Amino acid sequence: MSKKEPEEIKKNVTVGNYNLGVVIGKGGFGTVYQGLDIEDGDFVAIKQINLTKIPKDQLQGIMNEIDLLKNLNHANIVKYIKYVKTKDNLYIVLEYVENGSLSGIIKKFGKFPETLVCVYIRQVLEGLVYLHEQGVVHRDIKGANILTTKEGKIKLADFGVATKFDDTSAAAVVGTPYWMAPEIIELNGATTKSDIWSVGCTVIELLTGSPPYYDLGQMPALFRIVQDDCPPLPEGISPPLKDWLMQCFQKDPNLRISAQKLLKHKWIQASIKKKPVENGAGGVGNGTDSLGAPANIDDIAKNITDYNERINKKPSHQRKPSIHPKSPKGKVFLPPPEEEEDEWGDDFSNTPKSIKLPDKKSPLKLTNNKPSTPLKQQPTNNTPVQQQQQQQQPPPLKLAVPKQPVIENDDDWGDDFNTVSDLSKAVGSLNFNNNKKNETPKPNIKKPTFSEDEDEDDDDDGFGSGGDDEDDDFGDIPTSIKLNPKFGSNIKGNSSGSANTTNSSSTVVQQPKLTVSNNNNNNNKKLPLSPRQPSSGNVKEGINHGSTGSKSGGVIIDQWGEDGEEDNDWGDVATVNFDPKVIRKGTVNKPDLSTRLKNRIALSETALSNSFNNNGNDDEDEDIFADDFDEDDDEDFDLDKNLMKDNYARMSSEILKLMNLLTPEQPEEVISSACTQLITMFKENSEQKTLLIRRHGVIPIMEMLEVSNIQSHVLCSILKVVNQIIDNNMEIQENLCLVGGIPAIMKFSGPEYPASVRLETASFISKMCSTSTLTLQMFIACKGLPILVDFLLSPYAESKRLVWMAVDAIVNVFELQSPTPKNDFCRLFSKCGLLKTLPIVLRDSIADGEAAATYPDRIINLFIMFSAADSVVRKTMSAVEVIRPILDTLSQLMPEQLAKVLKSIKQLSMDHNTLANLQNAGAIRFMVPFLGRRTGAFVAEIHNHVLNTMFHLCRIDPERQYQAAIDGIIPHLQYFITSHSPLNQFALPIICDLAHSKKARSELWKNNGVAFYLSLLEERYWQVNALDSLAVWITDETHKVENIIATNENIKKLIQLFTNAESQSFAGILEPLLKIIQISIPVNILLGTSNFITKIIDKLGHTNPQVRLNLLKIITSLYECHPNAKKMIQEFKLIPIIQKIADTDKSVLVQKMASKLLEAFNANTVI
């Protein structure tokens, strides 16, 4: 056993031939002492168990078990030596392991690295394989039960008999909770697969210092083990270890692999094949030998300490000096460009800021900020440092230029002016000079492509801000950019113009050949630009027509006109003062009729002026206004439309006058009257709202709201105007939010204001919560959610409209599509106290009847929303002051509403943090009666939710099991089971668990519990649970229970169960059956005198050694109680059968058990 600091010394205490020494361990079952064999001087560990903790009928079985276990012998298990029984205690003598347990090493030196864990777990598995081959289930594998020697070898301790002492408890849950397998928690019996789960938990314990769920209490941890699909795995583990752990943590024990197969896993095999690592490299390799076995314990301890120091050491944030020379400030070294295909689709939408055009012999390059010369004329008089920097600098980005202009035949040029606008803006940011005397001719570029994408920090249009950046000095750029576009098949001529981006309103030259020049350059170099086609949604851009020579005026107009498409007529764009960002949003409106006429006249005058410069070559009789008006333009002169426009203008003027009256200087009657008239006008002409905001904005209204001595009825009138203005207008709402409208209006929500003012405030808030994501986020940012909760606190009878509006607003918060997760809204509302208020509103709205018909459903849907939130919200909702009013309303709800509320309670019960609150609120008492409904709407849903809730509440907790029993759940459970309802999967585990609660058994007696359990023996998947319930029950109330079992009919049920049990459940029924046979003599005799022994003999060839061992134990027990043991031996010819097992069985324990049984048989036959 493990070695610890001396706690207590036993003086002059001798047990057999052993002296008791210091206490080296304590547990719930007893105390462990270091002992000294006074005959040979060997040190041993002696476990002392008080006889009062062992039932008298089980003492002999435990001593017999020790006699069996002392035959086990393996390097990786602690050896049982003997037992000594005194008047008061039972002493078990064990092998002494001097270096303590792995859990003690963790506490002393820190958590283990993965490589060392692998070395130790390999030995654990080897010891476990041996135990399982002998038919022994450890049941309590953990770090404290894995002991180490000074050589670093490990040994498994506390197996077999140690767990028998815990079997005496009524619950019969064996093992330590955090390492316990789910099937043990659910009382389905322990198997060898249960040990595999515990090994996985032990690995996590060694890696992290604690087992899974160690941060929880024992009961919550048990709940999570059963509830979760898999325990949380440590971060940073290797993929092989992760796969290994997933094999251990299969929830279904039948899918869990054996210890033998785990030894063959690649994670374990790596520790065997791993070669020793040099000292100091890796930290752990030098703690193992060449085969992966542990070295001296001192070396291992040192390595563990070093490993923990490294993982706990804070990383240094000091920057190391760079081996590369530091780049000069202002220089940007770009990576080498990649070759690109001649793909022209996106070149002008993604254009770099800096463009340098070299001479005609060199390709266009994108250079750094500093001026540069053409590639072939680069000076070489740089300093060595500069040369080194230039060598390290990647080559500049190149702008590829086609040698020949590309001619496009695409007549669709709707996007051309968009690109011209962007390029003109870009060229406005270039500073051209004339430093070079020999300039090459300007290239005629159709579509320049760039070999590198633009910087992500560029402006939206892909260019700079137009000369404001001091770093963008392009004084040495020798070449201009020129565009030679083809706007359409009917465009002819060659004109010149310029686009200047220094002004706020950019203009673009309106000629077939557009050129860009720099006004600051003495020798303007024109840049031919190739415009691109804008998308169909873009707004037309402004274009200045040229004044150079052209054809006749009629031809000029034809060149720029569109046939039959007034929307695509570019003649009216020249006067539009636009912003590219505004254009992109599509907010530039179409000019009215007068503007279009002015544009057409101006264009015609220019065309006429140009015709006089054509030396009389044009046709003087041509009507230059022939195409100015089409027949469709007659609609603009419609009398009705003009009357409507006049009426609109008068109304606009009236609204502006009324708005001017909304000032603090005006009398209150005037302000109220103005507000009333404004509301009427806005209802009749909603488009006037936009005009109002554009001309006056919302500031005048905001100023009125800030008046301190304003009367409540005036305030109410102003709020009505605000609500009318923002109604169904998202733009105005957002503008109002941006100028602080939300906090200015929210202050009127307090109970000190009249109900009318609060109602208008609630209307405003409701609109803010339901229109757009932006207004909702602003409302929340202004801490508006508590306001909604305050509205709900208003007296329902007096302010029901206010309460309803608050409920609507809360629902809108959850229904509006928002990037904020709904769980965050639940957390915020929960923090504001909403959950305490909603149940009261639900009660009042139910009592209100038809007047509030829809609001109970809305509130119930909110309950479902909150019950599905995170653990913090669920725990708040499960508070007694919240859940109790909800439970009180259950009987008043309609069936559909009841099903929804029960669903929300079920979702709460799935969180272990809520179970105690639900119990204290009386959830079991309120919900159990609903199981009695047999007909009606939504009955199946109601039963499902209630049984699920009871399943979570009663699981593992005897106190709640008893509460459910006295509240009458047993008859309902029996109904669902006997009627073969789909819900019996929840009813069966509940009723089987009730037998483990001593208090609940009194209710089971009232409902024929023993007979019901016997009937469950026919249920294929619940045979083990039902038989285990009988075994637990007969232990405490032997006489009453055995009187029911010990009948011929029920004995036949037991034999039939034994005969027909499938292989998966057969191993599970043997232990509870053995317990019943050992405890109840009448049952034992009835089975022993029947053909049951024949059935046992047929099963003795089972492959599982644990099954064979339990079968031999059953034969032994039947033999000891048989009224005619000699006849039994002869009748069933047991001696040769047992002799064969004793001679040939591979399990040491099975052989030993058979040998002892054979000795008893031979002694009886001799007698």
UniProtKB/Swiss-Prot annotation:
<keyword id="KW-0132">Cell division</keyword>
<feature type="domain" description="Protein kinase">
    <location>
        <begin position="18"/>
        <end position="268"/>
    </location>
</feature>
<dbReference type="GO" id="GO:0005737">
    <property type="term" value="C:cytoplasm"/>
</dbReference>
<keyword id="KW-0206">Cytoskeleton</keyword>
<keyword id="KW-0418">Kinase</keyword>
<dbReference type="GO" id="GO:0030587">
    <property type="term" value="P:sorocarp development"/>
</dbReference>
<dbReference type="InterPro" id="IPR011009">
    <property type="entry name" value="Kinase-like_dom_sf"/>
</dbReference>
<dbReference type="InterPro" id="IPR000225">
    <property type="entry name" value="Armadillo"/>
</dbReference>
<feature type="compositionally biased region" description="Low complexity">
    <location>
        <begin position="431"/>
        <end position="448"/>
    </location>
</feature>
<dbReference type="GO" id="GO:0000281">
    <property type="term" value="P:mitotic cytokinesis"/>
</dbReference>
<dbReference type="GO" id="GO:0004672">
    <property type="term" value="F:protein kinase activity"/>
</dbReference>
<dbReference type="GO" id="GO:0036089">
    <property type="term" value="P:cleavage furrow formation"/>
</dbReference>
<feature type="compositionally biased region" description="Acidic residues">
    <location>
        <begin position="337"/>
        <end position="346"/>
    </location>
</feature>
<feature type="binding site">
    <location>
        <position position="47"/>
    </location>
    <ligand>
        <name>ATP</name>
    </ligand>
</feature>
<dbReference type="GO" id="GO:0031272">
    <property type="term" value="P:regulation of pseudopodium assembly"/>
</dbReference>
<keyword id="KW-0723">Serine/threonine-protein kinase</keyword>
<feature type="binding site">
    <location>
        <begin position="24"/>
        <end position="32"/>
    </location>
    <ligand>
        <name>ATP</name>
    </ligand>
</feature>
<feature type="compositionally biased region" description="Polar residues">
    <location>
        <begin position="365"/>
        <end position="376"/>
    </location>
</feature>
<feature type="active site" description="Proton acceptor">
    <location>
        <position position="140"/>
    </location>
</feature>
<dbReference type="InterPro" id="IPR017441">
    <property type="entry name" value="Protein_kinase_ATP_BS"/>
</dbReference>
<keyword id="KW-0963">Cytoplasm</keyword>
<dbReference type="Pfam" id="PF00069">
    <property type="entry name" value="Pkinase"/>
</dbReference>
<protein>
    <recommendedName>
        <fullName>Serine/threonine-protein kinase sepA</fullName>
        <ecNumber>2.7.11.1</ecNumber>
    </recommendedName>
</protein>
<feature type="compositionally biased region" description="Polar residues">
    <location>
        <begin position="508"/>
        <end position="517"/>
    </location>
</feature>
<dbReference type="InterPro" id="IPR016024">
    <property type="entry name" value="ARM-type_fold"/>
</dbReference>
<dbReference type="InterPro" id="IPR000719">
    <property type="entry name" value="Prot_kinase_dom"/>
</dbReference>
<feature type="compositionally biased region" description="Low complexity">
    <location>
        <begin position="493"/>
        <end position="507"/>
    </location>
</feature>
<keyword id="KW-0547">Nucleotide-binding</keyword>
<dbReference type="InterPro" id="IPR008271">
    <property type="entry name" value="Ser/Thr_kinase_AS"/>
</dbReference>
<comment type="function">
    <text>Serine/threonine-protein kinase involved in the spatial and temporal control system organizing cortical activities in mitotic and postmitotic cells.</text>
</comment>
<dbReference type="GO" id="GO:0005524">
    <property type="term" value="F:ATP binding"/>
</dbReference>
<feature type="compositionally biased region" description="Low complexity">
    <location>
        <begin position="377"/>
        <end position="405"/>
    </location>
</feature>
<dbReference type="GO" id="GO:0005813">
    <property type="term" value="C:centrosome"/>
</dbReference>
<comment type="similarity">
    <text>Belongs to the protein kinase superfamily. Ser/Thr protein kinase family.</text>
</comment>
<feature type="compositionally biased region" description="Basic residues">
    <location>
        <begin position="313"/>
        <end position="329"/>
    </location>
</feature>
<keyword id="KW-0808">Transferase</keyword>
<feature type="region of interest" description="Disordered">
    <location>
        <begin position="311"/>
        <end position="553"/>
    </location>
</feature>
<dbReference type="GO" id="GO:0004674">
    <property type="term" value="F:protein serine/threonine kinase activity"/>
</dbReference>
<keyword id="KW-0131">Cell cycle</keyword>
<keyword id="KW-0067">ATP-binding</keyword>
<dbReference type="GO" id="GO:0106310">
    <property type="term" value="F:protein serine kinase activity"/>
</dbReference>
<feature type="compositionally biased region" description="Acidic residues">
    <location>
        <begin position="451"/>
        <end position="475"/>
    </location>
</feature>
